[in-house]
Amino acid sequence: MKRIFAITIAALAVLPTFAQRGITAKADRAFELGKYFDAIDEYKYAYAKAKDKDKKNQIMFMVAESYRMVQNSRQAEIWYRKVIKKGYENPLATLYMADAMRAQGQYEDAMKEYQNYTKLNPSDDRGPAGVESCASAIEWMGQPTRYKIENMHYFNSKYSDFGIAYAKDDYSMVIFSSSREGCTGGKISGVTGEYYCDLFRSRVDRKGKWSEPVPLEEIINTAYEEGMPSTNKKCNTLYFTSFREDKNKNMVCKIFSSAKENAEWGEPKELNLAPDTVAVGHPAISDDELTLIFVSEMEGGYGGKDLWKTTRANKSSEWGKPVNMGPAINTAGDEMFPYIHPDGSLYFSSNGHPGMGGLDIFKASEGNSGWKVDNMKYPINSSSDDFGIVFESEMERGYFCSNRPGGKGSDDIYQFSLPPIEFTLTGIVRNGKTDAIIAGAEVNLIGSDGTNITAKTETDGSYNFNLSPNADYRIVVKRGGFLNSKDKTTTKGLTDSEQLRVNIDLQPDDRRMDLYGIE
């Protein structure tokens, strides 16, 4: 829940004033204002007071809805299941229960509930899409990608830690959002039940030890929310989301930038991207700082939260009119947490594209025919929410965020890396007649990649070579007193690191022995 504050809470600035009546008035008001954490307690209180069966069912559904909005999948499932057993006639209870089960990795059971929902509402594509999502998740978990991930317990806390960016161009410092103790103002959010988020920084030393995170300067952090940082290539300009008062004393979520001045961040400047009453957040800046992609629910979108793009002619120019990223990127669901890779590809999180559950991380590559969107699959993605990926320049290494089980807090930061694919060739050369080991044999490796190297077998008859990906190889073995022998191998079609083994037998050259009268 913490990670989407920038878009959800902004509704506070534009909601009309209304007076509600009845035992759920306070709960309904909290829910409408996005204060879902507060709404849970208020609805439970109202449920205990309610006498009418239908009213109690409605309240149970709203308790489940509130848990859904704070991403508490376990409690959401429990309350949806309760209201379904009571005969509540809203098909969405079945759909959202299936979503909650999928978010907990209960794929087989979730598939059954998606099928039940399709029976209740055959015209809604979300039922079949849920079944497809669960089937894909099961397949992807059975065939994980080569990415390795590690929880950054060095600076994660028991609270929510997310939204990370590099703060130095040598990647030795990071800035991230956190709702930990020590946040400016020390106030608890009615939306999340945690402290309002601030931006923190941490630095790694030469021994790989990370420093204790400390808040950024007070000129950046306020008593309310700051989060989702993005930095330029030189790491001397910071873009971030902030929740601040406008001139009419309304709380509005906007994007700000701050330039570094004498090693300190300067006065933040608001980016003029939308009217005052329109919430914008989650900035992603390109390396040249001429393109900015951000999140908004402004008019002209495709459903929930959409990705929008704005450009400018140079760094001193004003930003142009935002343009929606289009239906290849945006869906009827939510698209958030964009990141512009140095190679021009776009990474973002979505619960609208087919995924494993909750928010999944996607890579979008632009070609002549438009954008091609691919799921990052497992283990980058999980049944939980996975979001906010950043890369260490063009290296296959960086960070992302997740609320998957096994973390330290409600949202954690994870490091990921893609180990290089490594192929080795090894084998033993033996006497084909006696099976004796042959030392000192010449092994010549000739490859389609241009390789042409020779090595001699060790005293144990072994040889070793490093191989290139996607190449064919011939192996020629020679030794005095033996006939030459040949073999072949290939790395074509191999997608994971592997040690190939080719043992070779040399047959004694009996003709040569006969010349010397040896039998």
Where are these regions (language model features)?
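Alpha-solenoid helical repeat scaffolds
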Residues: 24, 56-62, 91-96, 112, ...
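Short coil turns that delineate tetratricopeptide repeat
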Residues: 51-54, 88, 122
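Short, acidic Ser/Thr/Gly-rich low-complexity loop/linker segments typical of extracellular
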Residues: 448-462
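Short, conserved micro-motifs composed of acidic
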Residues: 73, 96, 103-428, 432-434, ...
